UniProtKB/Swiss-Prot annotation:
GO molecular function, a single term: RNA binding
Keywords associated with the record: RNA-binding
Species of origin: Rotavirus X (strain RVX/Human/China/NADRV-J19/1997/GXP[X])
Domain of life: Viruses
Residues in DRBM domain copies: 328-395
Matches recorded under InterPro entries: dsRBD_dom
Record protein name field: Non-structural protein 1
Length: 395
């Protein structure tokens, strides 16, 4: 099967990949696509799978079937009816590119095996969707709170900054962080328990309803595919084609999409978010996930955007990828301790949120003194603390 062969590299390495790598594998690296799990109880050699391979979406190399550790019945099951699902492809690229797909957020948290029991497009309790224009989020679960602080950003297709990498401060969360464009996204309502059996996993067939981000809204009217499939085994391209064939169209037309592309290529600056993103958070996320979001902050400064990206790159200096300008006070302080026989300085670095921005606080201990400094990156904070100590002790 072509869609299985396309994912051959991932499937060969499946047993040696970490949970984080398996999640990232659901987002194609080279171009947007749709990665579907191959369940242990699924029939991937039968006529239904053959029909999928003959479609335009498959021939365009946008459908991938990757191995899974689960049976279809072990998947996270949203409510019987009424849960939402994106009809967009997924993309793993983190560089500047014009793209309307869903993107994963790189973070410092460890993944749990349970987080793989969902599709990136589904509004599940395991997924947290973050629209463009947001730089920080605060999540509360009981008495525990967590800050999701963006540390690297790229230009979204609507020119607003969108999170690429984030630092999790506080209680770790078992959520898959996914970003989307708040100006152009399409969802459907999925009804998962309908008559008929899925031709792949033998689960119940799913039907779909249009959401408010389609033209020609038909609230409550269910549409079904000719091919008997559940939402877990259905490529999103099939759902999109189904809605288009029943008279629905996205609010952003193909002509407008191309105009946005030309504008994106022409405009170098970033647009500051001035709209209320609360409705987008509510539409995209599961109800319980949305209720846990207690605070979020807009990106209100282009200068901060550039500073965050530059500090993210500056951390590469420790790998000798980028030179560090100016005196190296860390080295000078070490030389001073060796020259006079003192114990070498020690450093403590912690992540903090200062004025709504992600920062690092470094404390330098040398002899009987300590200095403290805060900076946008670990290296920056450490250099500043070492500089303060060097100037105090050596002059």
């Amino acid at each position: 099967m072509m869609s299985i062969q396309r994912a051959a590299q991932i499937n060969r390495q499946f047993d040696y990949m970490s949970i984080k790598e398996l999640w990232m594998a659901k987002f194609p690296l080279h171009k947007p696509g749709d990665c579907l799990d191959m369940f242990k109880n699924g029939d991937y050699t039968g006529p239904t799978m053959g029909c999928i391979q003959k479609t335009k979406a498959s021939k365009k190399n946008t459908i991938f079937h990757i191995k899974s550790d689960f049976n279809s019945t072990e998947y996270d099951e949203p409510p019987i009816s009424g849960f939402k699902m994106f009809t967009q492809h997924c993309c793993q690229r983190i560089d500047e590119h014009f793209c309307g797909a869903l993107h994963p957020v790189i973070s410092n948290i460890e993944f749990e095996h349970n987080q793989l029991k969902t599709r990136p497009q589904v509004a599940s309790e395991l997924n947290l969707f973050i629209p463009c224009g947001i730089k920080n989020l605060k999540i509360e679960s009981g008495e525990k709170s967590t800050w999701i602080v963006g540390t690297k950003f790229r230009k979204c297709m609507c020119l607003k900054p969108v999170i690429v990498a984030a630092t999790i401060i506080g209680t770790p969360i078992n959520k898959n962080l996914i970003t989307f464009c708040s100006s152009d996204y399409i969802q459907v309502i999925v009804n998962r328990n309908r008559e008929g059996s899925c031709g792949i996993c033998m689960g119940n067939v799913s039907t779909y309803e249009a959401c408010g981000n389609w033209t020609n809204e038909t609230w409550g009217e269910e549409f079904s595919l000719d091919l008997k499939l559940c939402y877990k085994c259905t490529p999103v391209a099939f759902i999109f084609s189904l809605m288009m064939s029943t008279g629905h169209k996205p609010y952003v037309s193909k002509k407008q999409f191309e105009e946005n592309r030309r504008k994106w290529e022409r405009v170098l600056n970033y647009k500051i978010c001035k709209e209320n993103l609360d409705s987008h958070l509510a539409c995209a996320n599961h109800e319980n996930v949305y209720k846990s979001i207690k605070k979020y902050e807009f990106f209100d400064s282009v200068w901060v955007y550039h500073l965050a990206n530059s500090s993210w790159v500056r951390d590469l200096t420790r790998e000798c990828i980028e030179s560090n300008p100016g005196p190296n006070y860390i080295q000078l302080l070490n030389e001073h301790s060796q020259r006079y026989g003192f114990v070498q300085p020690t450093y403590e670095i912690i992540a903090v949120v200062s004025d709504g921005h992600h920062s690092y606080q470094c404390t330098c201990y040398y002899k009987d003194m300590k200095t403290q400094s805060t900076g946008p990156s670990k290296k920056n904070a450490k250099h500043q603390a070492a500089e303060q100590m060097f100037r105090h002790q050596c002059f």
